[in-house]
A protein has these predicted regions:
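Generic low-polarity alpha-helical segments
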Residues: 1-3, 13, 135, 205-208, ...
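N-terminal start-of-chain detector that recognizes signal peptides
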Residues: 106-112, 116-119, 128-130, 219-224, ...
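A short, sequence-level motif marking secondary-structure junctions
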Residues: 149-151, 219-221, 437-441
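Long, contiguous juxta-domain segments that are non-catalytic but functionally important
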Residues: 7-9, 210-233
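Extended hydrophobic/Leu-rich segments
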Residues: 194, 224-226, 473
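Terminal targeting/pro-maturation regions of precursor/exported proteins
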Residues: 18-213, 236-280, 284-287, 292-294, ...
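Bacterial Sec-dependent N-terminal signal peptides
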Residues: 1-21, 30
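C-terminal "post-core" interaction segments
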Residues: 20-37, 206, 228-475
Length: 475
């Protein structure tokens, strides 16, 4: 029998910053992570196919031997992991950023500037003619004070932050003024790298291209709504427009700030939505995220109880720690004692069940009911295609249980049977492995999403889907 004998502790001790990696070791580490943490392991590898899997792994390991190029290594690893036929289980390759001049073997040097909230407020009171870009700005993770350090050079100093990698008095952004234009340097949240961007000040909004900050003081006469501004600039933001008395929603993704942006659109167009009898919900190309983004529309969609299947989690020491650090740690640190107690109890239960597939509810599914659903819309066309995957598929499964909804388009991509993904680092800084922690319990009924994707109720031609959907709604 083919065996891998390099200890994981040795792998983890190797230099994690190498740009030319030892692919043999990365393979062994990835294989061990999958076998010990992947939620689909017990479904995918059985006594019947185990010899085939062992032979496959031995063959791929022999092909990988001697590979030192990161990119080639990542492709070879992806080829190996394709055995599991799970698009959520995959290798992630991050090409080194070309604008990074800092040696990867050294930590990125972060500037500091001693400045408290009181000192910042005092600075702006005493500065008679501050530069337009100077001020105190807010962001979901930071409060920053942008002050002039010397002519045409500004620091955005952290006054407070919820990001554990940063602390007050560290400089999050540097900005250089050239004439009437600004050029800024943005330091990543994990302090691993930096990038340069054109910077614009639009009334009270500091547009840093990849992040937006809202000016709190000094006061600005014209104030833009930050969420509306984000929607106008964010290609992945949800959108809503009306055509031929049809409300047309587009959800490119359920990631990023989509939840807040969707809530904003629902409130802004509330009256119009409640009086529009035909809707289109366009999920083509939706690559997932949090299905609850779209679930905010449930009062409009609902007609009868909705069955929502639960999941069971593969609980391991590594998965539990990664889950908490990835999804809960920041929220936990900002929570009050009451919420912390609830989280502590759940984490304790998870740790008590290490080595098991764990379903906290002990129920295969739950039934969702809505007491006062809206009358309108009366008809909903929900559009999907081969690029609708993950949480986009989950939302489709829930929404199509409504009598209002007809799913149109083409088969979805099929990537939902195993989810709640964790991203593990490998010894190679450019390669990570994405491992699903959860197994959906509809699998036990013999139903699978991943095999063929979700089938629409009505197949449509690829071109002009919106027009086709409108025509069918009007019939």
């Amino acid at each position: 029998m083919f065996k891998f004998i390099l200890p994981l502790c040795l792998i983890l001790s190797l230099n994690s910053f190498a740009q030319n990696c030892n692919c043999d070791s990365v393979f062994i580490q990835s294989k061990q992570l999958v076998e010990e943490n992947y939620a689909g392991w017990f479904d995918k590898i059985t006594e019947k196919n185990r010899p085939d899997y062992i032979n496959w792994s031995e063959k791929k390991f022999n092909e990988i031997k001697g590979v030192t190029n990161d990119s080639i290594c990542a492709k070879q690893l992806q080829n190996w992991i394709s055995y599991f036929n799970d698009k959520h289980l995959r290798i992630l390759f991050t090409k080194p950023k070309s604008n990074t001049t800092q040696s990867k073997t050294n930590a990125l040097k972060i500037l500091t500037h001693n400045l408290s909230v009181d000192e910042a407020n005092d600075y702006f009171k005493k500065t008679k003619s501050p530069d337009p870009i100077e001020g105190i700005y807010s962001h979901p993770s930071y409060q920053l004070a942008i002050t002039k350090i010397k002519p045409n050079l500004f620091y955005a100093t952290i006054l407070s932050t919820t990001n554990e990698n940063w602390k007050p008095n560290e400089v999050k952004l540097t900005i250089i003024k050239k004439g009437k234009e600004y050029l800024g340097t943005f330091y990543d949240g994990d302090k691993s790298d930096f990038s340069t961007h054109k910077v614009k000040l639009e009334d009270n909004i500091l547009d840093f291209d990849i992040a937006f900050f809202e000016k709190q003081s000094p006061n600005v006469k014209n104030k833009l709504d930050l969420t509306e501004y984000e929607i106008s600039k964010d290609k992945d933001a949800p959108s809503l427009h009306f055509k031929e008395n049809v409300a047309i929603w587009k959800f490119p993704t359920f990631y990023s700030n989509s939840e807040e942006q969707t809530a904003y659109l629902l409130e802004k167009y509330k009256v119009q939505l409640e009086n529009t009898s035909e809707w289109i919900i366009d999920l083509r190309g939706n690559d997932g995220g949090d299905y609850r983004v779209g679930w905010q529309l449930i009062n409009y969609i609902y007609t009868k109880p909705i069955i929502k299947y639960n999941a069971e989690s593969r609980l391991t020491k590594q998965n539990n720690e990664m889950w908490f650090n990835s999804f809960m740690k920041s929220y936990y640190e900002q929570s009050d004692d009451k919420i912390k107690k609830v989280i502590d109890e759940e984490v304790a239960k998870m740790n008590q069940n290490i080595g098991k597939m764990y379903n906290g509810s002990n129920l295969p599914f739950e039934t969702i009911t809505i007491n006062k659903p809206f009358i309108n819309p009366k008809k909903i066309a929900l559009l999907i295609d081969e690029n609708t995957v993950s949480s986009g598929e989950l939302f489709t499964m829930l929404a199509r249980q409504s009598d209002k909804v007809v799913v149109m388009g083409n088969n979805s991509g099929g990537m939902m049977d195993y989810g709640n993904i964790l991203r593990y680092k490998t010894q190679c800084s450019t390669i990570r492995i994405q491992v699903p922690m959860d197994r959906m319990l509809w699998i036990d009924t013999g139903f699978f999403v991943d095999k063929e994707g979700l089938k629409p109720d009505v197949y449509l031609q690829v071109n002009n889907l919106i027009e086709q959907a409108i025509d069918r709604l009007k019939k």
